[in-house]
């Protein structure tokens, strides 16, 4: 064996030019096991160097003779030399790229629905059930797949039996199949505004935060689900889902947000988890209505809200009803005119409610008592707020002609000239 190693060490001297380069690629000079020496015999005797001609074959013949006479190594006849490359094309790709190729999701035609579409394959999470240190040979590595200490002693590296390893692999496969079966189960969802739309459907509370905070007292409602498209150079018209949701706890804290993703459920999750980080606190009068009438315009959407007594209910746009229930407003009238774009409607509603002026703020600004006249109390005023500073002596001036913009529809309703077919309809509280 030592003679063979010395002979191979002389390869740079014996071999020159193209032949030396070829021999250098055929064998590793660090170690020469039995199978490698057998391969050398076949190469030097009758194989790959025959095409180089007979002019420079004398050094090769000497080397072959040295290997055959001085190395007596017996090896089974079934052993073969095989080239091994640990770095291949598949090691360059990520798992997502490999799955796209396996599921035929990379073509632009497949994205656009062109061609005959067979039954769609589903992606499996092969990392589910995997533990660091687990392999096909069942080695037990302390600190990775088994505890480091057992009964007060440090465990050593061991190996499972063949039966135990087969049981572990079967449990892993069963766990993946159960997860896929669980994902296919359809849960009957709550009915929203109508049977064929996502509007008004509850998504439950947002997911817990990274620091352990929970939002069990919050609820999430879907306001709008839309398909949006963007033009890309590779895929053409690419589709994604845009979701608008609102969250609230029914005690004045509420917010809204938008989530966008290619998958609908991912968009729901993004939107509800983002909305809980953009909350508004809405002041409520006696925890059931707004403090005063509000009229606002946001872009091309006009919203007019009116304060109502207890028991009146919510007579508004269905999206406003959903948001008011999340806030905790129980009695209010609202009318929407102009554009009814859902995003503009939601933004305008939150802007108007968050900018309303409470009775205490009005009393401090005017320096006067704020009183309320109720029908059940007659002409007796009820003081609802008093200024914290000095009380002003002169009363608030009253204009002869109040600067109020009248709506012709409201005027006709007040004078009895207009009667809606929905006027006596009572909504069921949900």
From Swiss-Prot:
One Gene Ontology MF term: RNA binding
Keywords per UniProt: Mitochondrion, Ribonucleoprotein, Ribosomal protein
One term under GO cellular component: mitochondrion
One Pfam family hit: Ribosomal_S5
InterPro entries according to UniProt: Ribosomal_Su5_D2-typ_SF (IPR020568), Ribosomal_uS5 (IPR000851), Ribosomal_uS5_C (IPR005324), Ribosomal_uS5_N (IPR013810), Ribosomal_uS5_N_CS (IPR018192), Ribosomal_uS5m_N (IPR048584), Ribsml_uS5_D2-typ_fold_subgr (IPR014721)
Biological processes annotated in GO: mitochondrial translation; translation
Family matches, as PROSITE patterns: RIBOSOMAL_S5, S5_DSRBD
Protein location: Mitochondrion
All residue ranges annotated as the S5 DRBM domain in the record: 218-282
Main location group: mitochondrion
Highest taxon listed in the record's lineage: Eukaryota
Keyword Ribosomal protein belongs to the record: yes
Coiled coil regions, renumbered to chain: none
Keyword Amino-acid biosynthesis annotated: no
Family recorded in the similarity comment: Belongs to the universal ribosomal protein uS5 family.
Subunit details: Component of the mitochondrial small ribosomal subunit (mt-SSU). Mature mammalian 55S mitochondrial ribosomes consist of a small (28S) and a large (39S) subunit. The 28S small subunit contains a 12S ribosomal RNA (12S mt-rRNA) and 30 different proteins. The 39S large subunit contains a 16S rRNA (16S mt-rRNA), a copy of mitochondrial valine transfer RNA (mt-tRNA(Val)), which plays an integral structural role, and 52 different proteins.
Name of the protein: Small ribosomal subunit protein uS5m
Species the sequence originates in: Homo sapiens (Human)
Gene: MRPS5
């Amino acid at each position: 064996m030592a003679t063979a190693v010395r002979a191979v060490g002389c390869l740079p001297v014996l071999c020159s030019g193209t032949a030396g380069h070829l021999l250098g690629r055929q064998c590793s000079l660090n170690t020469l096991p039995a199978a490698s020496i057998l391969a050398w015999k076949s190469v030097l005797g009758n194989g790959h160097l025959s095409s180089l001609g007979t002019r420079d074959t004398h050094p090769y013949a000497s080397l072959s003779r040295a290997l055959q006479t001085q190395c007596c190594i017996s090896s089974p006849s079934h052993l073969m030399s095989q080239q091994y490359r640990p770095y291949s094309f598949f090691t360059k790709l990520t798992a997502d790229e490999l799955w796209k190729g396996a599921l035929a999701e990379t073509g632009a035609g497949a994205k656009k629905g062109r061609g005959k579409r067979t039954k769609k394959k589903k992606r499996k999470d092969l990392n589910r059930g995997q533990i660091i240190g687990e392999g096909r040979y069942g080695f037990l590595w302390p600190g990775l797949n088994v505890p480091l200490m057992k009964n007060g002693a440090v465990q050593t590296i061991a190996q499972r039996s063949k039966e135990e390893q087969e049981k572990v692999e079967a449990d892993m496969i069963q766990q993946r199949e159960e997860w896929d079966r669980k994902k296919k189960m359809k849960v009957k969802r709550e009915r929203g505004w109508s049977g064929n739309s996502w509007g008004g459907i509850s998504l439950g509370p947002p997911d817990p935060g990274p620091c352990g905070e929970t939002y069990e007292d919050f609820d999430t409602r879907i306001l709008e689900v839309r398909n949006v498209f963007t033009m890309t150079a590779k895929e053409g018209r690419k589709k994604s889902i845009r979701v608008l949701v609102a969250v609230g706890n029914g005690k004045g804290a509420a917010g809204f947000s938008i989530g966008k993703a290619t998958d609908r459920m991912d968009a729901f999750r993004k939107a509800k988890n983002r909305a809980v980080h953009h909350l508004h606190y809405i002041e409520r009068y006696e925890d059931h209505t707004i403090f005063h009438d509000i009229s606002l315009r946001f872009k091309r959407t006009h919203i007019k809200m009116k304060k109502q007594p207890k028991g009146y209910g919510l007579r508004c746009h269905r999206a406003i009803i959903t948001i008011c229930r999340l806030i905790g407003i129980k009695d209010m009238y609202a009318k929407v005119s102009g554009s009814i774009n859902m995003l503009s409607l939601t933004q305008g509603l939150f802007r108007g409610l968050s900018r309303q002026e409470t009775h205490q703020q009005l009393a401090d600004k005017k320096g006067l008592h704020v009183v309320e006249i109720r029908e059940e109390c007659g002409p007796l005023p009820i003081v609802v707020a008093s200024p914290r500073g000095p009380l002003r002596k002169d009363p608030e001036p009253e204009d002869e002609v109040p600067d109020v913009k009248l709506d012709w529809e409201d005027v006709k309703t007040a004078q009895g000239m207009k009667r809606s077919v929905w006027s006596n309809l009572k909504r069921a509280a949900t």
